[in-house]
Amino acid sequence: MVEHLNEIKEIKKYALENKVPIMMDDGIDFLTTFIIKNQIKSVLEIGTAIGYSAIMMALSNPYVMITSIERDEVRYLEALKNIKKLNLEDRITLIFKDALDVKLPDKFDLVFIDAAKSQSIHFFEQFSRNLNNNGFIITDNMDFHGYVKKDEKEIKSRNLRQLVRKIKEYRVYLEENSDYQTEFYTIGDGISVSRKKDKLDI
């Protein structure tokens, strides 16, 4: 990863200048360590943005293959450019489409949800069928910049209040989903890790 430091710095700089949300450093560290520790070989990412997290996942393990979905054309094209710059086209496949319109036959060790927060339950339900037995679903932004922990009265924007409500609903959905064992981490912007239970665990 050291030889790609300049390219990674450039991607992070672009994200900052163009207000593209990317994972916090400790969130990325958690994700890449998780991939190494759990010997993840295949990842489906919902929400490519400019390709930062997909690139970091690919660089963490030379054997991991990533499929990533992005619906915003500008971000999708920027991600393509970044992936090409790092010669990772053979390991990262991008799909330009709304994730809810994507149907994939493939199975993955990990599904990583980092897209529209209001749709997290839909993403989980749609793509959990693409998960290998004992696979994982990781979701970013569970704290959403600290707003999830605030009293709703403190949040002035109506749209933001609705979004926070959706994230809270998603958390309850994960806690009550008996097919998965979910743990929540106060790392980065809040991360949840849901492990698909073995039939014997249920």
Q: Over which residues does each language-model region extend?
A:
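A short alpha-helical cap/connector motif
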Residues: 1-110, 117-138, 142-202
